[in-house]
Each structure stands twice: as structure tokens, then as C-alpha cells.
């Protein structure tokens, strides 16, 4: 969607800025063992948001372009718009924001598209404030924005976009998790759509205590392995016994794709976010790149084209653009 944008009402900040633009990458959330807790950025693909400071005390979306345009222009129904509405209300700002969203992340891909728009909007808007606020404060407004898309406040796609790298995300704080620089992630996105709300509905039902114990054990192994740089610990723990068994049937070719990654020495593989994308961890970039064709072939075997990305787990956070 293309629309003419009226710049006549853009208000300069105390630092002279009328407009700011920010990029936020895609992300992998849950990471098999940390449902709604763990995530990391996926460098190389993401959303760009341009924000203008305007006289009118409102938030409005002027345009949405790119890979996904079937998104609400109403600010309160859009994660980026809702996040800026939360920011305005909390700071009692006398001015408003106008934004344009350029989407680079496919809708309902399990790659954090709603979070990317949300964080990019906040990073850009923060640059337009007379007194920018802290990352912790921005994170709280991002949680408000993300709730529009998923129906609940959770930060596993948001935290990594503020800090970069693997991040443990509670509702109150963000904790960076050290990961060896050499470790890389492979993410493969099959050209299929799995709505986040439908994926969450699949999780309804009873869970056994033994499942929670096993999942807690796996989370501890992964965190300890990352901290120590011990690939064997991560390999022992990077498996999902709670969520994956309930969501995997919704993703055609998932079992074959996961097996292909493990056959190429992945430390582990599972569903990225709500799916249908799949992620896998490897000790080197070369190993991740070598596995990509096999994982894509698994999806091709069920009639799905796909895209693949190989990036460091320690990929960078969202950033302002010149």
C-alpha cells in the first residue's frame, strides 16, 4: 500500500530530529526448551519502520509495504501502533507519531514478524523523544504491542531485538545468555502459514508433572551448556517434550526436516516460535550451511518451497538507520 505522507506537521525534537528510521531483525522464539522465555535474533531479514513526530496527539499508520501488507492500519490493532500508543500514554506526550512499516518478514511464519515491527517502531520513536527512555522501559511498551498479535504479553521475540544474541525474557527483565561466537543457527521457512493463535490453541489440555520435570531439566542443560561453551550439554538438552509434540502435527514435513538437521550433526532442532519455520543449532557456520539443502529437501518432499538463513546465534539487535 502506497500513500502520500504529509510532512508539514512533523515536529522537530529538542535535538532537531523530525524523523527516525529503525530496522529490527526476525527472531527465533522458544528455542525448544524456553517456551515464552528464550529467543535470539535472525540476522539478514527483518522489518524497517519510519517514524515521524507530529503535532496531533495520536498514533497513525500511513502505510504498510513489503512481504506482508494484509495488516491493520488502525494503530490499536497493529503491534507497532499499539506499542507507540502505550509509549505516548505512559509518558503523557503532548505530540504524536506517524509511521510507515516496511515488512520483510512473512506473516505467521514463526519468525517474529509482529515483534520486529513493534521493536523497530519503538527504537525509532525513542530517538525522537526529547529525553530517550531506557531499554527496560521500551521493553514494557513492546510487551503491550506484542499482546495485540498473540493475545498475551510474552517477550521471547522482543528481548533479543533489544539486546542481541540469546536472551532470557521474563515479563520484568531481560537476561543475556552467553553463547560461543562460533555457534550458528539454521532457520528454514516453508512457504506455509500457521497462525499464532491456532498454534497456541494446540497447547490446550493437561500436562504430566514428568513432562515439566523433563523440560526443566532440558532448559537447565541448555543454559549450562551455553554458559560453559559445552556442545555436549546443549545436545543433551536441546529437545522439546512439552510444545513440539503438540504443534508438530500442524507442520507438514516437520519430522523429516528435523531429522535432516540432526543427521547433519545439529546440536538440536525444533519449531521456531509458533511455526511453521524450523531452527537448528550447529557448532560452526559451515555445518549449518551444509545442512540447509537437506532440511529444504525435506520440505520439498511434501510439496513446500522454502527459504533458509544461516546466522550466528549472537546476531545483532535492532538498530537505528541513517
From Swiss-Prot:
Location, primary (coarse class): cytoplasm
Keywords from the named record: Amino-acid biosynthesis, ATP-binding, Cytoplasm, Kinase, Nucleotide-binding, Threonine biosynthesis, Transferase
Short name of any one Pfam family annotated for the protein: GHMP_kinases_C
Catalytic activity: L-homoserine + ATP = O-phospho-L-homoserine + ADP + H(+)
GO CC terms, sorted: cytoplasm
Molecular-function annotations in GO: ATP binding; homoserine kinase activity
SUPFAM superfamilies in the record: GHMP Kinase, C-terminal domain, Ribosomal protein S5 domain 2-like
Known EC number: 2.7.1.39
Residues binding ATP: 106-116
Gene Ontology terms describing biological process: threonine biosynthetic process
Subcellular location: Cytoplasm
Pathway(s) annotated for this protein in UniProt: Amino-acid biosynthesis; L-threonine biosynthesis; L-threonine from L-aspartate: step 4/5
Role this protein plays: Catalyzes the ATP-dependent phosphorylation of L-homoserine to L-homoserine phosphate.
Assigned protein family: Belongs to the GHMP kinase family. Homoserine kinase subfamily.
Name listed for the protein in its UniProt record: Homoserine kinase
Organism listed in the record: Xanthomonas campestris pv. campestris (strain ATCC 33913 / DSM 3586 / NCPPB 528 / LMG 568 / P 25)
Lineage, top ranks: Bacteria, Pseudomonadati, Pseudomonadota, Gammaproteobacteria, Lysobacterales
